[in-house]
Structure formats: C-alpha cells, structure tokens
Design a protein with these regions (language model features):
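Catalytic domains of carbohydrate-active enzymes, especially glycoside hydrolases
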Residues: 73-91
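N-terminal secretory signal peptides
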Residues: 1-11, 38
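Twin-arginine (Tat) signal peptide motif
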Residues: 8-16, 29
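Glycine-rich, proline-tolerant flexible connector loops at the mouths of alpha/beta enzymes
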Residues: 88-112
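Conserved, mostly hydrophobic/aromatic
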Residues: 60, 77, 85, 117, ...
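Active-site acidic/histidine proton-transfer and metal-coordination neighborhood
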Residues: 19-30, 35, 43-45, 50-52, ...
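Short, acidic/polar
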Residues: 67-77, 143-152, 262-270, 326-328
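Acidic/histidine-rich catalytic cores of soluble enzymes
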Residues: 55, 84, 127, 186-320
Length: 375
C-alpha cells in the first residue's frame, strides 16, 4: 500500500465532530450557546493573521547521522538551511556529536563546540538524553539518572533551555526486575501496580530531578509521550506535570499519538494553552489499513525489516499525512505561542536518515512559508 494513499482520518473526524455538535444543540437547547461559543473560538484561532505568528525555527535531531563527524554534519545542515539542532547527550540517542565529559571539564571547549554551530547560523536549541531513570534494574536507573544530571549541567553551561527525555517505566513492584508498562487497571492487581509505580517511583524521581534542574536554571524538561513508558499520552503527561510542577512539559512527537487516534491539532491546542509544550519532534506515521482492520493498532511486535505484518510504522513528514494536515499542525503550534523548534527526527524504515531528513525539511519549509506568506 502506498503510504500517500492512506485516507485522511482528520476530515472524517471533522465531519463527525460537526454532526455531533449539531445533534447536541438540537437535543439540548440550553447548551447550544456554549457549543456555538466553542465553535466560534476555534474559528477565531484559525483566522489569526500570519503577521502575528512566530516563525518557528526548523531543526534536526542528530541521531539520524551516526556516521558523520560533527563538522561533517554541520556542513550538511548548513547546506540544507537547517536553523537549529537537537543534540543527543547519551541514553538511547547516544552522544555521537557531543563529547559531554570534555565539554563539562573544559569551559573553553564548550564555547568552541557551540560556536562551531553558531558560525553556520545553527542554534543549539535542545539537548536530549532519553532513557529509563526509574528502571527496576538499579544499574540502568542510576546510569540514566546520571546522564540526565550531566545533561542538565551541560545545558546550564551552554545556555540551552530545554532538555528532552522519557519519563521511564518501573517494574510492577519492589521485587520486579523488568519494566512493566500498564495501560489498563483491571484485573485489580494491575491497578495496584500502576498506583505503586506512580507513588513510589515516578513522582518521587521526577520531583528530585526537576528540583536539580531548577537549581541549575533549567525550567523545561520535555518528556516524550511514548509507548512502554508511564507518560505515553497527554493525560499521563499532565498527571505528572500536576504532581511535579511546571518544569515538566511535553516533547510533542505526534507520531506516537497518531496511532492512539489523537487529533493532533486538538492535542496541540490543549497542551499549548497550558504552556505545556516545550519541544516538538516532526515525524509522521502511516497506517496499513488491511492490517489495522485485522489486528488493530496495538500491533507492534513485527520485524521492522518486514512491514508486511505491520499496522503502522514511522515515516518522514509527508509520507503518512498530507502536507495540508501538516499545515494545520504547524499553524496550531504557532497559534498557541509555542516557543521551541520543529525538530525533524528520522526513524523511517524505508528512507535513509539523509533522504528522510532532507525530504521532511522540504515539506516543513514549504508549509511554513505558505502559512506565513513568505518565500
């Protein structure tokens, strides 16, 4: 199936939402005015003048280029007109282009490293250290917690305001040895395990991690809503933010929300109005309808080299959803006052890192120009 031929689910949802709105107004006249006000508010957001919208920088997340030296990567990004970078500092992204220890040990090296990007008009916008600092394996938990702490210290030194990572996932109890991702509270023991995870592991860890970040001038910890971690959707993100504080926000990677049937624009509006979006990965998802119909969307256990059994897979921007959908998404980020960057992440199993990133940049730049009325 050609990914571009996948049906546009948003138009169908828009139709159903409009139909439901009208039906509700007829069935409950006393609520019609409130529903009309909601519709008017959404319409007003869609009619914001381009002149008032921020030109959000378009950047790249560096793990897509593991075989390039830092200088080679900078040369390539400069040739492509990349405006910002998200740099891995350890954990799952590795630290291929960032010698963390050297930069922490020598302030002059840190200044020179950052200047290397800035001399090519590339902003070092974000440091990323995705890991599992609440792992039931104490060695993994301490390793990833230390990676987070060192990333905070490096961000402080470099003047970077945003750190990206995962919430992590504990085991199901104090004697467990492997993580246990729980999304359903029944049978009863699963609900008990979930409560234990949040009360005993997740909230205590992130309270102290946020305190450490705050003490070093870092006030934006962008957690990626990702399967297999306790923060995997907007609701769990907001739960942790409420428990820990406003240092916790979202790395809004919509590729993980599309398969959960989230409406991307609604997610951006909801989180954006709370000032809870700190970072945005730009990555797409395509669905294989026959497999969705047969197996549903919780169909991840397939060989990434054989997509014949997959219900969905990551794609470069524009290869899962249309450019018009991405226009709505990018405009929504602008309308809610998002202050970060658009960071292209390539995990496309079909396109190489270089091809996937370059094609995503092409789509995003053209869509941004169309929104802002620029060239």
């Amino acid at each position: 199936m050609d990914p571009k031929s996948a049906p546009n689910s948003r138009s169908r949802r828009d139709f159903l939402a409009t139909t439901s709105l009208l039906a509700a107004a007829v069935a409950a006249p006393r609520t019609a005015s409130a529903l009309t006000a909601d519709a008017a508010s959404a319409s007003a957001e869609e009619n914001v003048s381009p002149s008032t919208l921020r030109r959000i920088p378009i950047g790249v997340f560096d793990p897509a280029f593991p075989n390039l030296s830092t200088d080679e990567m900078i040369d390539k990004f400069a040739a492509w007109g990349v405006e910002a970078v998200e740099i891995g500092t350890g954990g799952y992204p590795n630290s291929t282009h960032c010698p963390v220890k050297d930069l922490l040990d020598d302030p002059a090296k840190a200044r020179a490293w950052k200047k290397n990007f800035e001399d090519r008009n590339i902003q070092v916008a974000t440091l990323s250290c995705h890991g599992n600092p609440v792992s039931p394996d104490p060695k993994i938990a301490e390793r990833d917690a230390e990676t987070f702490r060192r990333t905070v210290l490096l961000a402080e030194r470099l003047g970077v305001s945003v750190i990206v990572g995962f919430s992590g996932c504990p085991g199901g109890g104090p004697t467990e040895t492997v993580p246990n991702w729980i999304t359903y509270r029944w049978p009863t023991e699963y609900g008990q395990m979930l409560d234990w995870q949040w009360k005993e592991k997740v909230i205590p860890y992130w309270k102290q991690a946020a305190k450490f970040a705050r003490e070093h001038g870092i006030h934006k910890i962008a957690l990626e809503m990702h399967p297999n971690f306790v923060v995997y959707n907007p609701k769990t993100l907001l739960r942790l933010r409420e428990a820990v504080g406003e240092e916790i926000g979202a790395n809004c990677d919509l590729s993980h929300l599309f398969w959960q049937q989230c409406d991307a624009v609604e997610v951006i509006r909801m989180l954006g109005k709370q000032g809870a979006i700190f970072h945005a990965h730009m990555k797409d998802t395509t669905f294989y309808k026959n497999n969705v119909d047969r197996y549903g969307v919780l169909n991840f256990a397939f060989d990434k080299n054989d997509l014949s059994g997959a219900s969905e897979t990551f794609r470069a921007v524009g290869y899962g959803h249309s450019a018009s959908t991405w226009k709505e998404i990018m405009r929504a980020y602008m309308e809610v006052g998002y202050q970060g960057i658009f960071s292209v992440e390539n995990e496309d199993p079909i396109l190489s890192g270089e091809v996937g990133v370059e094609r995503a940049l092409y789509v995003l730049k053209n869509v941004r120009n169309e929104i802002l009325g620029t060239t």
